[in-house]
Amino acid sequence: MSSICFAGGNHARLPSKAAYYRAISDRELDREGRFPCGCLAQYTVQAPPPAKTQEKAVGRSADLQKGNVAPLKKQRCDVVVAVSGPPPLELVYPARVGQHRLDQPSKGPLAVPSAKQTSTAMEVVLSAEEAAITAPWLLRPCKGEAPPPPPLTQRQQFAALKKRLAVKGQQIIREHIRARKAAKYAAIAKAKKAAALAAVKAAQEAPRLAAQKAAISKILRDRDVAALPPPPPPSAARLAAEAELASKAESLRRLKAFKTFSRVRPALNTSFPPPPPPPPARSSELLAAFEAAMNRSQPVQGGFSLPTRKGVYVAPTVQGVVRAGLRAQKGFLNAVSTGIVAGARILKSKSQNWFRRSMGIAHDYVEGCMASTVLGCAGPVVQRQEACSVVAAPPIVEPVLWVPPLSEYANDFPKLTCSTFTEWQRPRKQSIAISNLFRKLIDRALLVSGVSLIASVLLFEIAENFAVRQAVCPVEMPSCATSVSEKSLVSLDEGNFYLRKYLSPPPYPFGRESFYFQARPRFIGPMPSMVRAVPQIVQQPTMTEELEFEVPSSWSSPLPLFANFKVNRGACFLQVLPQRVVLPDECMDLLSLFEDQLPEGPLPSFSWSSPLPLFANFKVNRGACFLQVLPQRVVLPDECMDLLSLFEDQLPEGPLPSFSWSSPLPLFASFKVNRGACFLQVLPARKVVSDEFMDVLPFLFSPLVSHQEEEPEMVPAVLEAADSVGDITEAFFDDLECESFYDSYSDEEEAEWAEVPRCKTMSELCASLTLAGDAEGLRKSHGVFLKRLVTYLQSFEEPLYSSRAFYSVKVKPVYRPKKFEGHIDCTCLDGNMGEWEWRESVDAMWRCPGRLLNTKRTFTRDDWERVQYLRIGFNEGRYRRNWRVLNLEEMDLSLHEYPEISSAPVQSSLFSRVVDRGATLASSIPFVTRSNCQSSLGTPGLNVHTIHQEAPTTLRAPPFTGARNVMGSSDAGANAAPYRSEARKRWLSRKQEDSQEDNIKRYADKHGISFEEARAVYKAPKEGVPTQRSILPDVRDAYSARSAGARVRSLFGGSPTTRAQRTEDFVLTSPSAGDASSFSFYFNPVSEQEMAEQERGGNTMLSLDAVEVVIDPVGMPGDDTDLTVMVLWCQNSDDQRALIGAMSTFVGNGLARAVFYPGLKLLYANCRVRDGRVLKVIVSSTNSTLTHGLPQAQVSIGTLRQHLGPGHDRTISGALYASQQQGFNIRATEQGGAVTFAPQGGHVEGIPSANVQMGAGEHLIQAGPMQWRLQRSQSSRFVVSGHSRTRGSSLFTGSVDRTQQGTGAFEDPGFLPPRNSSVQGGSWQEGTEAAYLGKVTCAKDAKGGTLLHTLDIIKECKSQNLLRYKEWQRQGFLHGKLRLRCFIPTNIFCGHSMMCSLDAFGRYDSNVLGASFPVKLASLLPTEVISLADGPVVTWTFDIGRLCGHGLYYSEGAYARPKIYFLVLSDNDVPAEADWQFTYQLLFEDHTFSNSFGAVPFITLPHIFNRLDIGYWRGPTEIDLTSTPAPNAYRLLFGLSTVISGNMSTLNANQALLRFFQGSNGTLHGRIKKIGTALTTCSLLLSLRHKDASLTLETAYQRPHYILADGQGAFSLPISTPHAATSFLEDMLRLEIFAIAGPFSPKDNKAKYQFMCYFDHIELVEGVPRTIAGEQQFNWCSFRNFKIDDWKFEWPARLPDILDDKSEVLLRQHPLSLLISSTGFFTGRAIFVFQWGLNTTAGNMKGSFSARLAFGKGVEEIEQTSTVQPLVGACEARIPVEFKTYTGYTTSGPPGSMEPYIYVRLTQAKLVDRLSVNVILQEGFSFYGPSVKHFKKEVGTPSATLGTNNPVGRPPENVDTGGPGGQYAAALQAAQQAGKNPFGRG
């Protein structure tokens, strides 16, 4: 027997036995037992039926059982199984009819392939054994055979089979449905992509098409205008009609889009015109955007609109935003419409009856105004349509369309507009027919307010009926053509008691049956809000009368008030909106409003920006609620303050007016406002005149749907909101236009308001209205009233009454922040005292004490900084201050100041030891402003500023003709010549022969002073010994022209100082007596930060005028232990020439001080040595007996220095001049009984000894003017040897006074130069020396990381082709330094800062990192931080040879192509007014031109390390404005990488070099740079600590620390850890930063204290740091898992990344790979070591390893080195490689053709377990061009450099991944992906 199943061509049957078994075991049929196709089965019986005694098959039909051949046409089944064997049976399993009929071909595991789906089914035949196993109950028992006992009944087994098959069928159906959905979504995505491409193409073509269209339109328009007469201008009515038609069409289109999904579907009127065709569907785009917004995890903003208001709710999800907005809208509309609609229904009939009785005419309302719409809502149409909850006002001509509920408006979520919700609703029918109307209305405040409002509306429309109509039949109104009618009072019935109570002039008794109502229209203003009990009657004057009193205003403004509601001070402005009459019973206290309206659940935080008149008797208007919330940032907790305590100091004087506030949500006592950004602005208060006393007037002309319309088309009702946002599906957005999804607005809010049609302004509305009337109805008072009405409307600002009034109005507040112009404004009534207070506070903050100058002098830049402002007393009263300002000419604005004395600077007595400073004279200096001060530029290039005065302040002698040159004169080379021993001997011999008196006379004659003065000077060193005071002047007066008087700032900003710049403890190295013991250290007198700041000021040289050495020994008086200190200039190899001075003393003499005057002049290059070796201090002792390890003395050294400009002229004070004269004879001063020695003589006598090298060790030496002699070179050394001398205790005459107060020797001036100091400009030729001039524009609100400008040095210099570039072009290569000079606007308050970064090797790639330049990347590159406070001129000098590694070629780059990036570091703390600009120059400084490549190595191995450079920035770091600021700590991980973005990280070359070392000890040097606003100040304390040690401010004072009193400056701290060292790769050390003063900021300034930290270097103590290994051998890569036996590989000998498709490559990361990747190029020699291991037992194994080195490829290949090794044996091979190309250097980038290549081959490679490639660096290996490492992402992810997946192998370390050779890897990988090996042969 066989069975055949048909299903409309799709056959459902089991193809084989195995399929049947799977169907039984896998449950591959559905729950109801259907095969997936739901087929119709037909059966054909091919064998006679069995005997009747056989058991019937379950599920068979009667026809089958009877043996009928006819098919079962109506039987639907899923499975038909034919079982062969005795007896043959078939199983028919019927399915349910009409369920899931699928027409598609069958799919799934049981589906038949399409090629096998034929018209005949496949027979499934089972043997008897199989049938017995599968379904034993189907077999009929045979004769003579015992039937097997069935474990279950047939029905039970059939049910089990059915259940198992149903589960699999259901799974198949689900897979089919899932496939349909996938196809559908794919089609949607494809359509979306096509639409996006079309939109992009349309956007690209739009400008061109628009230009063509505009041009064609202009041509046609000009031709038509020339040919035709000008058409008449359209009337206002026509314009209004056109606007109305456009608005109606838009409304119809919007409503039509959602009609199919409306919950309420009333019957449509088929007589309506057909709607416009639907726009193309863009459902997929909108659905995707909506789903993306719904799935956002952060809080989102949702907006909705109400009449003239907008709202923005912030909720965790979009669903919460929609629900909150719809709930508020529904409540608002219900509350408003309840009173208004009910009141309108009452007043409609009453007013019309009154019209008929009084005027005899019927009143027609103007369609489109508020009254007609409200009354239309309350008409019969509302009653007829209440069943469908639709409120509509029928138009006159067109029938009314159905209106969708609010849920459909919610579906149009992205397009909510103002006009969508400006309709009225009546939610339910309410009975208003009550017995006691007055009592009920009093109880219902909302109904009372609505009646009051509509009453005013109707009364005004009475007058409007006579006077104001739409322009239909314009008739000019005759002036005063009618008179007032006699019927001015009309009787009314008793039912209108409420109107009589409030609208009639006199109060009548309560029970009077009738009263009169005045016929003339009168409007009642806001009532007094203080009335509480019962409404009072206010007698209002007529329109022609003047108001004698002021009425309190009524305020309406957005205020969503919750418990944690915040107010934004920054955007508050006052806007008075027209408001209805506020009844007394509608006023309530602020804190008790709307408690019952608090929404359920947690309340979100809001931020509010709106006017807030906060006064003591502030009231809230319960009547009309308008909701609007502006989008605002998150309010921080420290920016909040209580509501009632806001602006307490800004309350006006006098009684406070009553206000009425309109708000929809509750107020509570915990109401908070935003303290941080609040700024109150109040409109000018003026008296309200009678013409303006009509708050209801603007409502009469305000349209309801944001446009004026003659006939209202519809007034849709707002029904219930959607239950959930999940109801919104894809079909909701099918009919929306494409333009709805593409716009150029910054946010959705702007896009919403851009679609709102603008309302007609008052002027436009008045222009469209004309006056019309008749002789009977027009009254004289009406004409007067209308004139005043037009005047009243035209006087308003038009933006106040448009649909965007809240956003477009520009409020003009009275209160403004003060703007200080830098001078006193005599017209200011308050004297502008705040300006002086402000400037004095700034001066105090920046340490700028005030100074006044004489107007008759000419001042330089230094004097300009010392200008003092006149301080006007603050306790003189307002009148006195105003009088002094207004009477400026009569003011006594003089200051008594002590100018320079006109005598000798110092007069001292030989016997009394009293120094007489001389008499002082007080001079009257008139008050001047800064504009009167002038600066003397001097000669071109002069950077020295000498003060010109009327008379010399210091008595100076006539020019001396003899040979003299004292420190302080303008001769730069006076002390440059070396001291010769012969000249010194002659000078000493003359000194010994002459008497002391002769020496004094000679000294006096030489310097032009008296004998007494010379004797006092000569004896000055001995007189200073008992007091132990320094003879040096105060450091603040050393370089000033004043020797006495006020304290002033020093020249050139940097204050010279002789404070103890460095103090060391002298610890003996030998404990035994008689052995010499010494101790030495190096000292740099000027820091890197000081030099950088002085370079910006144009200085280039340092003059070391005085060196002060102090020895404070450890011991008792009388101790004869000798101590000797010698100071050398260690940059001179000859000690005789390098000696600055030496001093010897005894421990028993106590404190010893010596001041030397070396006159040493150094360029900044001399001070920028890598190890800081400028001065060397040697301390020794010959007879010390102190225990070993304890300090013998404390030695301090300090300098008195001055920075010089190119002119080398300088000015010193008289005190310093006298000090130099005191030490002239012996060239040093002594104290404490010390013996000092210094090079003698101020002038070198004799003949310079010229020396010409002749070779062979012979020199030609000049012996006289014309005499020369030939001799061998000889050298001599100057040795200071100490010896013990008996110095008893008799010389000790008492206690030693060790005070240092007043000396100025070790005083720190305590202030840095102000950041806004002006800088003296150079000569006019300076601009011509620039190689490039550029300009940069910065946006006023630029954010951190914004890339402002990029300077390609070679390209841009080539483009401008200036004089310098032409010189560069002639020579070829540029070497040396470049200086970038920026002219920036000086501003210390904005807090704006920038970074200038040099990228020489293209490490920044916009395709990888985006358009913004990461600040972290700039912090690792060579970078200078620039703040606007550093202006106006900022310079940055960098060495091209060191940073680029080679000289720059003039036309294009070689290995380096340097670019300078200008980027924003920190945002503006104080907002800028407009965009700004600055210019810069690129200058060549200390440069040379040559034709040499001139490579300068960054590091050469091996290297002698005296210091370890770090060279990176960290920050920006902020300190909060609080009384207890938390300390900031930097983790000092010098060797680890920095994460730049995402999983991309990098490190610079200095950090890569530190990877070679484990760690070190020493001293950490760095500096702090302030980048924030000057309004925030702070003093910092820095200290190093171990990570496990807790450090507080108290404990930091007790350990090594550094205090930056000004919040910035250089620092140096010793590394202090338990092991006296720190690790470069472990988190071990912290730099803790404490705020010890501040942060302090004035009011309204919320900017935190911001700074950057630069880590410069570590000064080593023990020399070479601890390396990571003894032999610098590194494993470059490893090969494993070879896929073929004959394995070959080749790569260029340049240490690249290696990729191979025939094996697995494991790249290693180590210091060598990082250093190669972080530098530009390298050169040197190395040995490649190949090592391999086997994965099998060595026996008869064959195979070999061969490696060779060849130069070039292919035919031109040159064989060099080759080696062959068997696989079994040493398992190692070595090949020496030289990393060079034709340039002498190489990179890890793309290979070339002619360069060394390494060829490696393995036979029987599968036997090799691993092949390792090691590299051993040889001596002389050099790296060039320090930069940062290439960017790569993690292994297995898309590479940021390659654009494809990285090779598997190089592991990440902590935060770093990737390896060297990114460019080579890119080229190699691209070639291998294309199917070829670029380095293979053939």
From Swiss-Prot:
Q: What is its main location?
A: host cell
Please report the PTM annotation for this entry. Specific enzymatic cleavages in vivo by the P1 encoded 3C-like protease yield mature proteins.
List the Pfam families hit by this protein, alphabetically. Answer: Nepo_coat, Nepo_coat_C, Nepo_coat_N
Q: What InterPro entries does UniProt report for this protein, alphabetically? A: Nepo_coat, Nepo_coat_C, Nepo_coat_N, Viral_coat
Q: Does the keyword Transcription apply?
A: no
Region annotated 2.5 X tandem repeats, Pro-rich sits at 554-698
GO biological process annotations for this chain's record? transport of virus in host, cell to cell
| Each sequence repeat, start to end | 554-606, 607-659, 660-698
Q: Which domain of life is it from?
A: Viruses
Keywords for this protein: Capsid protein, Host cell junction, Repeat, Transport, Viral movement protein, Virion
GO CC terms: host cell plasmodesma; viral capsid
Subcellular localization: Host cell junction, Host plasmodesma
Recorded GO terms, molecular function? structural molecule activity
Q: Ranges of Polar residues compositional bias?
A: 1289-1303, 1838-1847
Q: Which Gene3D superfamilies match?
A: 2.60.120.20
Which residue stretches belong to region Disordered?
1289-1320, 1838-1863
The family annotation for this protein states: Belongs to the nepoviruses RNA2 polyprotein family.
Additional facts recorded: Virions are comprised of 60 copies of the coat protein.
The record describes the protein's role as: Protein 2A: implicated in RNA2 replication. Could also be required for nematode transmission of the virus.
Give the protein name, as stated in the record.
RNA2 polyprotein
Organism of origin: Tomato ringspot virus (isolate raspberry)
